C-alpha cells in the first residue's frame, strides 16, 4: 500500500506519518520546508521520542519526501492508495489545487482503484471541508468520477506533540506523548477498509470529535489560560497547581455531562477518560508552554470551539457550568506579544468593554445571563 502525507511537521512525522510507516505502508511526505525535505530524502528515516511514564526512542524508516508545490506530488496522487494531511486547518485550502490536479491525472491514466483522503486536523469534519476546496478546483467533467472513486474520510485525532527541544540541531527529530487516538468515519471509505494499527474505525464519529473537543481541548485551553494568569510557564506546572486543577477538572466534568446526555457515553468510563487526560497534562517529558497552547484566543472563544460549544450544551440541557465560565474569563485575559489574536482580543475589550467584546467573539447574546457571569468572573480576575 502506498500513501502520501501532506505536512512533514512535528504532527505529521510524530503521529500520522509514524503510524502509516509503522504499518508497513510505503510513505512519502509532501511539504514546503526544503530543509526537512532534503533531510528526509538524504536519510529516509528519523527518530521519534515517545514519552510517558518512561521515554523510548523509535526509528521511522523507509520514508521519502517531495515538494507539495511541484509536479511530483501531482504524479503521486495519481498512484497512491491513501492521502493524509496534517497541515493545519488554514492550509487545507492551499493544498486542494494540487490534489485536484492529481485526481484529474488519476482519471486520465484510467486508475480506478479506490483512493481515500483523510485530513487529520484539529477541526470538526476537516476532510469534508477539504473535499469542498478540492471540488471547487476540479473541472466539471471530473467531479462525478471523483465522487465515484475517491473517499473523503473525516477523522478525529488526538496526540500532544510539543515543539521539539532538539529542533535546533536535527530538523527531523520529534517528541510525542505515548497516548494517541486516530478515529475515522468508516462510512465514508471507498473500497476495503484499511487495517492500520492505531487507526480506529467508527460509524459515530461526531460523538468522538466532541468528546475530544469538550475534554482534551477544553481542558488544555483552560489549563493554559489560568496557568498564564497565575504565572506558570508550562501545562504541567499549571495542572499541578491545585486551584487550577480543580477548575480544569470541574470544567471537563461539566462538558462531560453534556456528552453523556447527548451521546450516551458511560459516566464511569468518561470519568476515567478525564483522569487519563489530567495525567497527560502532568507528563514531565512534555514541556508544553502555556503560551503555545493558549494562542489564537479569538478562535478558541468562537461559537463552535472548545469553550463556548460545551457551554452552549450546558444551557441546552440545563446543566451547571461555573468552571467553564472561569475558563472563558481566563481566555479573555490571555495576552501574548507573539500572537496577533491575543492583541486583537485586548484591543476589542479595550474598545467595547468585556461584555460587548465577548458577545461579538462568541455569538452569545450580550444581555444573556452567561455573558454576565463571564464578565463578573473576568473582572474578579483583574
UniProtKB/Swiss-Prot annotation:
InterPro entries: 6-PGluconate_DH-like_C_sf, 6PGD_dom2, Mannitol_1_phos_5_DH, Mannitol_DH, Mannitol_DH_C, Mannitol_DH_CS, Mannitol_DH_N, NAD(P)-bd_dom_sf
GO biological process, one term: mannitol catabolic process
GO molecular function: mannitol-1-phosphate 5-dehydrogenase activity
Protein name per Swiss-Prot or TrEMBL: Mannitol-1-phosphate 5-dehydrogenase
Keywords linked to the UniProt accession: Acetylation, NAD, Oxidoreductase
Catalytic activity: D-mannitol 1-phosphate + NAD(+) = beta-D-fructose 6-phosphate + NADH + H(+)
Gene3D superfamilies per record: N-(1-d-carboxylethyl)-l-norvaline Dehydrogenase, domain 2, NAD(P)-binding Rossmann-like Domain
Family affiliation: Belongs to the mannitol dehydrogenase family.
NCBIfam families, per database record: PRK02318.1-2, PRK02318.1-3, PRK02318.1-4, PRK02318.2-2, PRK02318.2-5
Top EC class, one word: oxidoreductase
Amino acid at each position: 500500500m502506498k500513501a502520501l502525507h501532506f505536512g512533514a511537521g512535528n504532527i505529521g512525522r510524530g503521529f500520522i506519518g509514524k503510524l502509516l510507516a509503522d504499518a508497513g505502508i510505503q510513505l512519502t511526505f509532501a511539504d514546503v520546508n526544503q530543509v526537512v525535505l532534503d533531510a528526509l530524502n538524504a536519510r529516509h528515516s528519523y527518530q521519534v521520542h515517545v514519552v510517558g511514564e518512561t521515554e523510548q526512542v523509535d526509528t521511522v524508516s523507509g520514508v521519502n519526501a517531495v515538494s507539495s508545490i511541484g509536479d511530483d506530488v501531482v504524479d503521486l496522487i495519481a498512484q497512491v492508495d491513501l492521502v493524509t494531511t496534517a497541515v493545519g486547518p488554514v492550509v487545507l485550502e492551499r493544498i486542494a489545487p494540487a490534489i485536484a490536479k492529481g485526481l484529474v491525472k488519476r482519471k486520465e491514466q484510467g486508475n480506478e482503484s479506490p483512493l481515500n483522503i483523510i485530513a487529520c486536523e484539529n477541526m470538526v469534519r476537516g476532510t469534508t471541508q477539504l473535499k469542498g476546496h478540492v471540488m471547487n478546483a476540479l473541472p466539471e467533467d471530473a467531479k462525478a468520477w471523483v465522487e465515484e472513486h475517491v473517499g473523503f474520510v473525516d477523522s478525529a485525532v488526538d496526540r500532544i506533540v510539543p515543539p521539539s527541544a532538539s529542533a535546533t540541531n536535527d530538523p527531523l527529530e520529534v517528541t510525542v506523548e505515548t497516548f494517541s487516538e486516530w478515529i475515522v468515519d468508516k462510512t465514508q471509505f471507498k473500497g476495503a477498509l484499511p487495517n492500520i494499527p492505531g487507526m480506529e474505525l467508527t460509524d459515530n464519529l461526531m460523538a468522538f470529535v466532541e468528546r475530544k473537543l469538550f475534554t482534551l481541548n477544553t481542558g488544555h485551553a483552560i489549563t493554559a489560560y489560568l496557568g498564564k494568569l497565575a504565572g506558570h510557564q508550562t501545562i504541567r506546572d499549571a495542572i499541578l497547581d491545585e486551584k487550577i486543577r480543580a477548575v480544569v477538572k470541574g470544567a471537563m466534568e461539566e462538558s462531560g455531562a453534556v456528552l453523556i446526555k447527548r451521546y450516551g457515553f458511560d459516566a464511569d468510563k468518561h470519568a476515567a477518560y478525564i483522569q487519563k487526560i489530567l495525567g497527560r497534562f502532568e507528563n514531565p517529558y512534555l514541556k508544553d508552554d502555556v503560551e503555545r497552547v493558549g494562542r489564537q484566543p479569538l478562535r478558541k472563544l468562537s461559537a463552535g470551539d472548545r469553550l463556548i460549544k460545551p457551554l452552549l450544551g450546558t444551557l441546552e440541557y440545563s446543566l451547571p457550568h461555573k468552571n467553564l465560565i472561569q475558563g472563558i474569563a481566563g481566555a479573555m485575559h490571555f495576552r501574548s506579544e507573539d500572537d496577533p489574536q491575543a492583541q486583537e482580543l485586548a484591543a476589542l475589550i479595550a474598545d467595547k468593554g468585556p461584555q460587548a467584546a465577548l458577545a461579538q467573539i462568541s455569538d452569545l447574546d450580550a444581555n444573556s445571563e452567561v455573558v454576565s457571569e463571564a464578565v463578573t468572573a473576568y473582572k474578579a480576575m483583574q
